[in-house]
Amino acid sequence: MINKFWKNKKVIITGNTGFKGSWFSLVLILSGAKVYGFSEKKNNNDIFFKTLNLKSFYKTSYGDISNFNSFNKFYKKIKPDILVHMAAQPYVFKSYDIPLKTIKDNVIGTANILETIRVNKSPKITLIITSDKCYVNSERKKYFKEKDPLGGNDIYSASKGMAEILCNSYYKSFTNLGNIITVRAGNIFGGGDFGENRLIPDYFKSISKRKNIIIRNPKSIRPWQYILKPISNYMMVIEKFYSKKNYFNNFNIGPGKNSHIEVLKIIKVLDKINKLTKSYEIKKSKRKESKILKLDNSKFNNLFSVKKDKNIEHYLSLTNQWYSLFYKKNKKEIVNFTINHIKSYFKDS
């Protein structure tokens, strides 16, 4: 699936050992890109990276994204064509326990990316992944548009709003940053995610131990999207704006309205796939989390020719296959399944 645009492009991905970073880096390798990873050494969600043995595909340098010198030194060695910033403290609930680290990783880390491209020769384009939780959420069932106010009622969400504001401020302050695009995506699922307090990973962890999953907010609505959809959208954005000059924009990356679904429905679909009657218990959490989150993706869809999504049951079934192979400890089959699936997905794009 070598892609003419991506062939031999030098791409830095920060946070490459995490769930999304691992999938994205593998897709880019299969597309012909030269990938260079920068990641924190301690990562509790690097199982996909290890299972697919991605260290054999490209080199990862380990450092601290909240330390300017750590990333700047790495960047100067690579001199990338493209920079993708994904490194973050990615958990809402964890931000209550480690608020300062969340701010350091998500805000100062983003500032270090921007400062690095300011003081060095900038890449042609920098893609900064923030989150769909970057908006001020008043639970009004509205679909958030890119022009809506940024903010957050928890430290994680606020940190992503701050990262967006920083990107805009840097762009307006300096003229030598190349092209910068921020993308706001979230509730991404797929095989290989073992993150904390995430619905779908928790489901598979629980049923593998023959235990019920604990659901905090069964009626919460989220914009669920399969891992390869945002990745393909990220690639489309980079390809389109690569040759611009000092361009800035931001996009919501989200699914169609049919995939804005209640938490409990997701679990019931997975139970049906696994022929289970009821795998869950409901226990309310005391910690605050938005109940309703909906994204308006019309800005992106009006600019790009977007592949129509299959129904969410299809993607949950694919996700189920990945975890089934994982818990059967069939590593060779996981590798074959993942690579063949990526090739098939992009062939149909």
Where are these regions (language model features)?
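NAD(P)-dependent short-chain dehydrogenase/reductase
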Residues: S138-Y143, K147, I155-Y156, G161-Y242, ...
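Asparagine-centered polar/low-complexity signal
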Residues: D105-N106, N112, N187, N217, ...
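Residue-level recognition of oxygen-bearing side chains
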Residues: S70, K101, I108, L199, ...
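Short Gly/charged-rich anion-binding patches and loops
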Residues: W23, S70, D202, K265, ...
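N-terminal Rossmann-like NAD(P)+-binding domain of SDR-like oxidoreductases, especially those catalyzing
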Residues: M1-A185, F337-H341
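C-terminal substrate-binding subdomain of Rossmann-fold SDR/epimerase-dehydratase oxidoreductases
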Residues: L30-S31, G63, I207-S349
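Tryptophan-centered motif/residue detector
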Residues: W6, W23, V27, F48-F49, ...
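Flexible, glycine-rich phosphate/dinucleotide-binding loops
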Residues: N43-N44, Y135, F189, S259, ...
